[in-house]
Amino acid sequence: DVHLEQVNDAYPDNEFDYEIINYMEKMVELDDMIGLIMDELDANGELDETLFVIYPDHFPYMLDRDLYEEYIGIEIEDKELKRQTLIMYAEGMTPEVVSTPGSTVDIAPTILNMIDSSGEFTYYIGQDLFGSTENFVLFSDLSLTDGRSFLSMDETVFGEPFDMLAFEVVLERKIAALEIQKKILNSDYFKE
């Protein structure tokens, strides 16, 4: 309960469950840590040359789902649990919200395009999230989304109507890329 006082100061009349308070304390700890890093970079004259990239790889699964839904005030569909926010920050950066589907494979091309706008990143499986090309995300269960529609492997469809053939072509391409990733991760480059 190191940060309980800060949570109580922010929410003086809170009647949150202990799990929610514990989660909030972890967020305070993260915020404090980022602040310390920024202060140190600023003191060393390096803050202007730093890009912060923050990406949670999951929703707060350590929380009871019903409790989490009560806290955020909405009921979440299973597919929505996979939606996460990528935060990128640099000094002087103009704030912008970009709502496009993406996954971890899209982070490197996005960062590289911010640093080098040539857009020549053919060796990456992902794509620049700030680009104009429509992006699709393949999940570990091989379901696919373009942010508007969601196709599961049993061909259950959620969201807006779409061209099934086009989705199947993208699905095949994404699965092929996934196979390449597996080969890369499972190979011993230095042995061969």
PLM segments and residue spans:
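Solvent-exposed soluble domains appended to multi-pass membrane proteins
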Residues: D1-E192
